[in-house]
Each structure stands twice: as structure tokens, then as C-alpha cells.
């Protein structure tokens, strides 16, 4: 299997941390990690769009040549493919709460946090947008307090 990723982006980082945690627990998944240079636009090139038509990362290439394109779907696939020493365990309620927390962080904190970074000091050179930054900061407060 191959994981197509970019350093520092939240969704690929989530998957990379998951793989690293599982490796610490002794589960070698044998996943090759391939960096996609998003700064140079490689994620929008035809080669990557075959992997993920949305032009995003991560994308996990399975042994049969198909791809899983969303971070949580990749993690859940790996949980089931390598069940020994899984991270999302316990009762159905405990698993539900774990996924609930993941979704809150992903949708209500990490996404707006990335937008805030781009609105204040974008590593990609986007112009500053103080009003948007303030709005994103306000929107993150409730989930952060949760």
C-alpha cells in the first residue's frame, strides 16, 4: 500500500500519526509514504487526479490498485485490516464517542484553524484577511470549549 501525503496538512498528518501510533504498538502495516508537492501543484496534475479526483491528500492506494481518499475512511480501513492492537476499541458507545471527537476536531477545529492560518500568515502567500480570521477564531471557540 502507498499513502500519498503532504507534510503539515491536517488530514494527512492525522493518518500519519495513526500509522505511527500503530507502529509503536508493534503493527507494521508496510505502507510506503509518498509526498505530493502541493506547493508546486502536483495534487492537481492528472497523475494524482487518478488517485483522488478531488485533488486532495491523503490518498491510500490499496494492493488491488484502488484508492481510499478520506482520512477517517483510511483510518477505519486500517483498523479493520490490522485489528491486532487497534486504537479505536471498546464498546460501540466508546467507539462512537471516539469517532464523534475525531469529527468535531476535523470539521470544527482543524479546518477553521487552517483557514485562520491562511487568513493571518499564509504559508502559501494568500493575502491577509483580518475579518475572516476573527470570524474563524470565534467559530472555533465552542468546539474548543467542548
Locate each region found by the language model.
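Short, intrinsically disordered, charge-balanced linker/junction segments flanking boundaries
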Residues: 136-146
